[in-house]
Amino acid sequence: MIGADYFARNPAVPLSSIVADVDLDMPILTYDFTDVTAFGADRSSVGPSVKRAAARMNVKLSPDPMPDEGSFTRSDHYRFVEQGIPAVFVTTGFANGGEKAFRDFLAEHYHKPSDDLSQPIRYDAGAKFARLNYEITRELADGARPSWNKGDFFADKFAKRK
């Protein structure tokens, strides 16, 4: 997250020209995912774009499967949130074998030397995940400037001071 923090504080373009952040961090691509969790989508007008993109891809949106973990504040996108920029962190979901794949990866490889390029990957799942994120990004690029939802905690904490 150090690199994301540096970039969010020292962007190569004016911060005001960054309208949203779409974070692709650690999707588990070892199974045919049928759902995703979009952390933060419900906090801003990014949410409807995510819903439309997922519907076009026939991918279900699932709620946070581990809300006590605070995942919305634990990835690169949060550094942009701290700068007042709406963000979404999309990851593969727990349906269709996803929970087992996630828990196995966490137990066996997460932050361990075995987390390397020798791990299996389903390239069809990778292509689907990339396409979904492209669809989300295209929606955001072609639509109105994203805005925080009125009364959102992170909007009140970070967006108003920018």
Model-derived regions: residue spans:
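Amphipathic alpha-helical surface "interface" segments used
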Residues: 70-78, 151-162
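Metal-dependent peptidase/peptidase-like ectodomains
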Residues: 1-94, 98-100
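Short, surface-exposed, polar/charged, turn-prone segments marking secondary-structure boundaries
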Residues: 16-21, 48-52, 116-120, 138-139, ...
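His/Asp/Glu-rich mid-to-C-terminal helical/loop segments that flank catalytic regions of hydrolases
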Residues: 91-160
